[in-house]
Design a protein with these regions (language model features):
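Sensory modules in modular signal-transduction proteins
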Residues: 1-32
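Intrinsically disordered, charged and Pro/Gly-enriched terminal/linker segments
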Residues: 176, 196-199, 220, 232-398
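Short loop/turn elements at sensory-signaling interfaces that couple input to output
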Residues: 96-109, 115-118
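PAS/PAS-like sensory domain cap-loop motif
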Residues: 31-46
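Terminal output helix/cap of sensory domains in signal transduction proteins
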Residues: 49-90, 382
Length: 398
């Protein structure tokens, strides 16, 4: 063992060795640092003092566990990700690799490291520093997520013409369909469903003229609009004319985050997902919550928002940044208090962060939301997680 200590003692990865009876015979300084368990408390004890569990709280580190069964049978031992509770209450995700010392024997070296995204704090700081703002080159900044906001060259557009119900409704419809051309017949039916075609078209021409003037108060007479185009009987926003829309930017950041994930770059994915999350200031066209025409898009964007928050929470949890993971899940639950999978993940991350009591309270919050809103009870897997946390808390109480 002295030779092994000399060989492996300086490695940054945690390392310990066990004998035929699964008793720890070597425990390096890095193992102390990662687990919080001193060598004097580990040496001579069974290796299941680590109390490694899976993410559901089920014990994996047990006497004659599946790893040592494989060793004794001369089979390749599996590598596992385990959740290990440190003496300070914090739970950390570890990746373990097992090296047999002799075929058919339980003697082995176990190398482990904390499974976390390296440099997560730097990533979080970079994400915060790169939160998006409308580009200075954009003349018109439009926000549809949350209260409608239009900023023209630094000044808010809120002149009386834009507050007229029909003008504002037409403006919102064109902005909502910023990526396509809208036929005049569609606008006429949307704004004046009871009018005949002739009267509807007359009304539309007057309204569009008013809208152009409100968006460009200093446009010379008879000059074409810089922002609203007209072509082939269709109206549309000229996105190439310096128009920035938050929904467009939100979806671009989502796509770039997904692409970064595919390319194996979690740091870039986090930056883009955080950028997208910062753009979601509220419900899509929140002044029109009871309008059917934008309900489907509102729900779609909300689902995208919840999904990206869930991804961020998973990234942060993998990085050991449980505060960030917890915060993102709470933001997601604010949008959908009955999403049981969010409650479950939040319980798990609170538990891993050493906030066992808060994790149990989260189960009660989940149970109340489901009962009050849907008239149902939590799923068995949620209840099992609650019981596992409660048992763990009880086991550690004096």
């Amino acid at each position: 063992m002295d030779e092994m200590e000399e060989l492996f003692g300086e490695t940054a990865d945690g390392l310990f060795a066990v004998d035929q009876n699964q008793r720890i015979v070597l425990w390096t300084a890095a193992a102390e640092t990662l687990t919080g368990i001193k060598a004097r408390d580990a040496l001579g004890h069974p290796c299941h003092i680590l109390e490694g569990r899976d993410e559901w709280g089920e014990s994996i580190c047990t006497k004659d566990c599946h790893i040592f069964q494989a060793l004794r049978q001369g089979q390749p031992p599996p590598s596992d990700d385990l959740i290990v509770r440190r003496p300070d209450g914090r739970q950390v995700r570890m990746t373990f690799s097992v090296i047999p010392l002799q075929k058919g024997s339980a003697q082995a070296i176990i190398i482990f490291r904390e499974n976390r995204l390296r440099g997560w704090q730097e990533i979080v700081d970079r994400a915060a520093a790169q939160l998006p703002a409308p580009p200075s080159t954009a003349a018109l900044h439009v926000r549809l997520l949350g209260p409608l906001s239009l900023i023209l060259q630094g000044c808010s557009l809120d002149s009386p013409p834009l507050t007229r119900p029909k003008v504002q409704k037409a403006l919102k419809y064109l902005l909502a369909h910023y990526d396509r051309k809208v036929p005049k017949e569609v606008l006429m039916e949307f704004l004046w469903p009871e009018e005949d075609e002739e009267m509807g078209y007359r009304n539309l021409r007057v309204l569009v003229h008013t809208l152009k003037g409100a968006l460009e108060p200093h446009r010379p007479p008879h000059q074409p609009s810089h922002f609203i185009g007209q072509e082939g009987g269709c109206y549309f926003f000229r996105m190439d004319a310096g128009v920035w829309i938050d929904v467009d930017a939100f979806q671009k950041h989502l796509r770039e985050g997904e692409e970064a994930e595919k390319q194996g770059s979690p740091a870039q994915a986090i930056i883009h997902y955080e950028a997208a999350a910062s753009l979601y200031r509220g419900e899509y066209l929140e002044e029109d919550l009871y309008e059917d025409w934008c309900a489907a898009e509102r729900e779609r964007l909300k689902e995208l928002y919840i999904s990206l928050l869930t991804k961020l929470s998973a990234f942060y949890a993998a990085a050991g940044h449980y505060e960030g993971a917890i915060d993102r899940l709470r933001q997601a639950l604010a949008k959908d208090p009955c999403r049981e999978s969010l409650h479950r993940n939040l319980m798990r991350y609170l538990w891993w962060a050493g906030q066992d009591t808060e994790a149990l309270r989260q189960y009660e919050a989940c149970r109340r939301s489901l009962a009050e809103e849907l008239g149902i009870a939590p799923l068995p897997e949620t209840t099992r997680l609650y019981q596992r946390i409660a048992q763990d808390l009880g086991d550690r109480r004096p």
